[in-house]
UniProtKB/Swiss-Prot annotation:
Region (Disordered): 145-170
Cleavable signal peptide: none
Family stated for the protein in its record: Belongs to the poxviridae C7 protein family.
Protein known as: Probable host range protein 2
Alphabetical GO biological process terms: viral process
Ranges annotated as biased composition (Basic and acidic residues): 152-163
Function, in words: Plays a role for multiplication of the virus in different cell types.
Coiled coil location: none
Amino acid sequence: MHVFYAVIDNTIDLECLTLHKGVEYGCKLQLISKNTKTVNIKCITEVYYSDHLLKPLMAYVNDKLIQLDRKKLRHKIVYSIDLTLYDEVTNMLVCSNMDPDLIDRYYAKICLDFDNNVYTVKDKNYTNAVIEYPVVCNFRRYSESDSDSDVDDRAELHKRNNDSDSDDYT
């Protein structure tokens, strides 16, 4: 199973951006700010089965390809950028595939109005996109570390949940 989500300035969570079917990722963002503003954008892809590969992401701002910082962890890849908004409206596309049909018909379209703190999903398309603002932060989810202790914790939890004695009721 693949998961794709984004975090803006650690305060806005764009969740459930994964397509209902397939292994492509993407979303279209409309960023609105009348003043010059720098926003930190993190796009995260995760895989829950290690035998699946994560596809790389590309980003375009106002139709120009931009470079994302990429940090590969054990089960996820975090792409990030500090993007300075100069225009009143900045359009950003983050995607794993430049197929116009995917972009227009399948990826979510999201509007982030920083002037009025209004963040809306304009069109979910083939996703279940939702916005959480302000974020009630789950630090592990937004962390850019994937330490062995986190993996050990998940393994222990999995072991306890699959313990045959756990089905006994007394």
